Amino acid sequence: MLVTITCFGLNQACIKNHVVILNLLAPGRILEYHCYSNVDDLGVKRLDFNATPFTIKFHDEIPNLTKWNCILRQGPNNSMEYSYDVEVYKAGPRLIPRCGQLRAWAARIDGIYFARKYNTPLKRVLFWNK
């Protein structure tokens, strides 16, 4: 009798999760963002209107809580007077990681929009703080 065993590490067969940040504010309006997790800080960056979206790709931290936040800022004449600290991804403590999750966040003049799936409309979920 022949027994074959295949062993994968926790993340080898798991497609990375994606957090996508889009700037849909207005021509000339810059979105400033600072994204960080419990294990990584990506620093402060800027995204031009309709530029290629910024994407964070990651695996869930097992068995710890995986959480990503992004502080989004914008304003007329790049004043950055409007902001929101958004919890853009959260997976509770677990033994089996979430795989291939999408969290899309879009900054628009009237608020912050969200979608969990590709090819679904973004819906406003937050209003800017001043």
From Swiss-Prot:
Disulfide bonds: none annotated. Keywords: Glycoprotein, Secreted, Self-incompatibility, Signal. GO terms for biological process: rejection of self pollen. It comes from the Eukaryota. It is found in: Secreted. InterPro entries: Self-incomp_S1 (IPR010264). One of its GO terms (cellular component) is extracellular region. Glycans are attached at residues 64, 77. The keyword Signal applies. The keyword Glycoprotein applies. Pfam families: Self-incomp_S1. This is S-protein homolog 30.
